[in-house]
Amino acid sequence: LRDITISVEENEFVAIMGSSGCGKTTLLNLLGGLENPTHGCVYINDVDITQLSMEERSSFRRWHIGFIFQNFNLIPEMNVFENIVLPAKLMERNISKKEVMRIAEELEIEEKLLQNPMTLSGGQQQRVAIARAIYTHPTILLGDELTGNLDSTTSISVMKFLKKMCKKYSQTMIIVTHDERIAAMADRIIQMKDGRVV
């Protein structure tokens, strides 16, 4: 990445587009504190996360950022319900079965809650990962091709639900996508080329 300066407002839905290898995922990783820039800062809620220790950054991510990446990282030793509520348990928050069910119904996985996630299709696993990311209502939701394993109709349906949830809870959503239909749903599109915003 080179000479990138972007500002994203609270409750804004931003889509990042560009050809493969242009730096979209790297930018997303920087915004989520998964990588450090060689120069510059990353401010979230007036906190420069590049200055946080690894422990502080991990805690900050847990409380403020939800991730939906292409690698779902579901835990096979837990059922679907337990995977969804895991971040809340790590944060020592109360678990609302009603809220889990509401999200699961929206994502059409309500009948899978007691199953092992490894027995589900790729699309169903992706919906479990989405449910897990949004269950704690993070300040920022980051997604890398978050509907990549879903068919076109389901992709649009899931994105409409995510957009509704973000508006309801004043969340900011930043996603990387190659799908122009998904990008068209965003408030703003950032185009990248050769490591730069164009």
Q: Which ranges hold each PLM region?
A:
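H-loop (His-switch) and adjacent beta-strand-loop-beta switch element
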Residues: 189-198
